[in-house]
Swiss-Prot record:
It comes from the Archaea. Its EC number is 2.7.4.9. NCBIfam families: DTMP_kinase. One of its GO terms (cellular component) is cytoplasm. InterPro entries: P-loop_NTPase, Thymidylate_kin-like_dom, Thymidylate_kin_CS, Thymidylate_kinase. ATP binds at G9, I10, D11, G12, V13, G14, K15, S16. It comes from Caldivirga maquilingensis (strain ATCC 700844 / DSM 13496 / JCM 10307 / IC-167). This is Probable thymidylate kinase. Coiled coil: none annotated. The keyword Ribosomal protein does not apply. Keywords: ATP-binding, Kinase, Nucleotide biosynthesis, Nucleotide-binding, Transferase.
Length: 205
């Protein structure tokens, strides 16, 4: 057995880069690491990604929350749980808190979102990456997504507020992701290694 880590934050905050660099360094330090993301590669996850997100299909927020929850059950039972049992530090980009933040910002009751996700385990550690919206805009612009940001600025601000409120309520660590990437990664590494002590095998020791 090892641990399950969820890295959260709004679009453009740097989750993918931080997870990739963190995983590389954890492996260098002797840990088994498995990275994943949501929507997952399950049939439902692929449907969400290709038929809804990539095509900008309008879907009732409550229905979308149910689709994410269904994908999450498959993702947890078929990928996350087995890998944790095999001794991997599993790091996912997005999990339950993404549904809380995004569908919650679309008017879906947070209590209901949590209830429909109660069939999967909570992570051992949830890390929220945060950055000013102008930093996020710059990063999305570099990815050719400035138009997306400009269309969704108010929504992303609302999502960010939900993340920060949840972090306060649930004592999730919030990392300033506007800094130099090495500093961000070092903070995430410290949090994960502290949680992994006594639970995950380090093959360098």
């Amino acid at each position: 057995m090892c641990i399950f880590v969820d890295v959260e934050g709004i679009d453009g905050v740097g989750k993918s880069t931080v997870i990739r660099l963190t995983a590389d360094e954890l492996r260098r330090r002797g840990y088994l690491v498995y990275t994943t993301s949501e929507p997952s590669d399950s049939p439902i996850g692929l449907f969400i990604r290709r038929s809804i997100l990539e095509s900008n299909l309008e879907v009732e927020p409550m229905a979308l929350a149910l689709l994410f929850a269904a994908d999450r059950v498959i993702h947890y039972n078929r990928v996350i749980k087995p890998k944790v049992k095999e001794g991997y530090i599993v790091i996912t980009e997005r999990y339950i808190e993404s549904s809380v933040a995004y569908q919650g910002s679309q008017g879906v009751p947070v209590e209901w979102i949590i209830e429909v996700n109660s069939m999967v385990a909570e992570p051992d550690l949830v890390i929220v990456l945060n950055a000013p919206l102008n930093t996020v805009a710059s990063r999305l612009s570099n990815r050719g997504m400035l138009e997306y940001f400009e269309r969704n600025t108010d929504f992303l601000r609302s999502v960010q507020e939900v993340y920060l409120r949840r972090a306060r309520e649930r004592n999730y660590p919030v990392i300033d992701a506007s800094r130099v990437i090495n500093n961000v990664v070092n903070d995430v590494l410290t949090l994960i290694e502290d949680k992994a002590k006594g639970k995950c095998k380090n093959y360098n020791q």
